[in-house]
Amino acid sequence: MKKRISTIANLVQSFNPKLVYDIGCDHSYLTSYLIKTNQNLTIVNSDISKNALLSNYQKFKNNNNIHFFVSDGFNNLPELNINPKIGVIAGLGGLKIINIISQKENFINRFVIQPQSNLIELRSFLSLNSWDIVNETLVQDREFIYPILVIEKLKKPFKLTKELVILGPKLINFKDKHCLMKHYQCLLRVYQPKQKPSLMDLKIIETLNKIITSYESS
């Protein structure tokens, strides 16, 4: 978990924000990491679980820059007048991330997101709804490989090809090819067992098999 959290934190810090919204903060590990390097950073932690937030509040109650809200996504979050701001949604399923950033209350145009599932469906949504994937990386933490994306809202639509939705427009040039192929193999195992695959499922299987075979024969 340390490597995953530190990678998310480093991506957040690369934008030099003054305000961070950690949506679905769970145990507020990200807040703990961020305030070690920037005591002046304002951080809003939100979670659907009141009990989780109460436990986190006890750890940070003496820091006036750290705030806590029980909220399902943006439903109960205040828009603080501090800029630049960035949102983080990490450790939730891809469909839940889609739900959150689609909420009409959403006031954030840049996020670091780390989906636990439905990565391809998430990329497809981003492409169809004017969200640009400006960065994407993989982090291997113990036996798990986590995709982490930085996304920004565009003023004009920008659609990815099906192949780039499947493979990732930034991941195709990922330097650690061994880690990348392990990631693609994990994705392939999600789609292969389906009894009634859709046309998109078949395209995903074909595309992943093709790039994995190409790597193994090189």
From Swiss-Prot:
Record GO terms (molecular function): tRNA (adenine(22)-N1)-methyltransferase activity
Primary enzyme class: transferase
Compartments, as annotated in UniProt: Cytoplasm
GO cellular component assignments: cytoplasm
GO biological process: methylation; tRNA processing
InterPro entries registered for this protein in UniProt: SAM-dependent_MTases_sf, TrmK
Coiled coil: none
EC number(s) stated in the UniProt entry for this protein: 2.1.1.-
Keywords attached to this entry: Cytoplasm, Methyltransferase, S-adenosyl-L-methionine, Transferase, tRNA processing
Family listed: Belongs to the TrmK family.
PANTHER family: TRNA (ADENINE(22)-N(1))-METHYLTRANSFERASE
Name of the protein: Putative tRNA methyltransferase MG248
